[in-house]
Design a protein with these regions (language model features):
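Residue(s) in the substrate-gating loop at a strand-loop-helix junction
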Residues: 145
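Active-site helix of classical SDR
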Residues: 125, 161
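Substrate-binding pocket helix/loop in short-chain dehydrogenase/reductase
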Residues: 101-102, 106-114
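SDR active-site lid
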Residues: 178-249
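Canonical Rossmann dinucleotide-binding motif of NAD(H)/NADP(H)-dependent dehydrogenases/reductases
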Residues: 4-38
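Active-site loop immediately N-terminal to the catalytic Tyr-X3-Lys motif
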Residues: 103, 150-157
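The beta1-alpha1 cofactor-binding region of Rossmann-like NAD(H)/NADP(H)-dependent oxidoreductases
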Residues: 45-46, 63-74, 107
């Protein structure tokens, strides 16, 4: 078995898209604290400036639509000229969400998601890869998702884009064999970020009449991992030379169920959810009795 190639990115320049909030902001903060000059990009200028204000290392800020291939190439050229140290890693992290059944899906929403979640990753990879290849070291780190491991209802656009990121990154990694450059897939589970708040919702995909604010609250209640912990896991995984980084206990659960029961994992998840709900109700009832 081929051993993982350990690498050090601390102290080297890092590029991070989707850095205005969530995992991207947490990565910028963590890597900045590990002496990395950071080039941060996002379409949200206000959030990006808030991230910049929290950093303690040389920073390059760029308002960027990752779906714009030419803008990505311009950003890469700017980073090449600016970077005070060799490039250690490029984190193609920007992402958005939608939710609807296949029949209710709005094509414009699906295109919007795909242009950011998949083509944004491709654009960033193609823009920065020549720099890494030239220096013969570094990592392309692409954010897929736990939904790039298993398919889920009402998430056909999101799942398909994240599966595409996974396949693209795995293929690229094979192309880079024998070089000092690698490509890494990141599969976050439920992370407490703004992705649901910023998603495009037309109506409750489950037909329960929930508002977007209610769905945001439900998502926050089930997230198991905070962004700073996700950033720690990703940073450590890159330096350990992992080809795939699972973020959060739910990511490991989905990965395991997808491997063991590739056609029945959703049924098993439903059974597990029922058990957890019963335990939660029983625990709440016991607390009321004691009080």
């Amino acid at each position: 078995m081929r051993k993982s190639q350990r690498r050090t990115i601390s102290g080297r320049t890092a590029v991070i898209t989707g850095a205005a909030s969530g995992i991207g902001r947490a990565l910028a903060q963590r890597l900045s604290a590990h002496s990395c000059p950071v080039a941060i990009a996002d379409i949200d200028e206000k959030g990006l400036k808030e991230t910049e204000a929290s950093l303690h290392a040389p920073t390059l800020l760029r308002v960027l639509d990752v779906a714009d291939a030419e803008a990505q190439r311009d950003f890469a050229a700017e980073v090449r000229d600016w970077a005070p140290r060799p490039l250690g890693a490029v984190f193609n992290n920007a992402g958005v969400a939608t939710s609807s059944s296949v029949l209710d899906a709005v094509p414009e929403d699906d295109d919007w998601l795909w242009n950011i979640n998949f083509h944004g990753v491709v654009n960033g990879t193609r823009a920065f890869l020549p720099i890494l290849v030239e220096q013969d070291e570094g990592a392309i780190v692409n954010t897929s998702s736990v939904f790039g491991l298993v398919g889920m209802p009402n998430q056909s656009a999101y799942c398909s884009a994240k599966f595409a990121v996974r396949g693209f990154t795995d293929s690229l990694r094979q192309e880079l064999r024998g070089t000092g450059v690698t490509a890494i897939n990141v599969h976050p589970g439920g992370i407490n970020t703004n992705i649901v708040r910023n998603a495009r919702w037309r109506k409750d995909p489950e037909g329960r009449g929930r508002t977007q604010d209610q769905m945001v609250q439900e998502f926050a209640a089930i997230t198991l991992t905070q962004p700073d912990k996700a950033a720690e896991i990703i940073h450590r995984g890159v330096e350990q030379g992992k080809a795939r980084i699972l973020v959060g206990p739910d990511a490991y659960l989905f990965d395991t169920l997808g491997r063991l029961a590739p056609t029945r994992y959703y049924d098993l998840l439903g059974q597990l959810e029922s058990v957890l709900r019963r335990r939660s109700r029983a625990s709440a009832a016991a607390e009321m009795t004691v009080s």
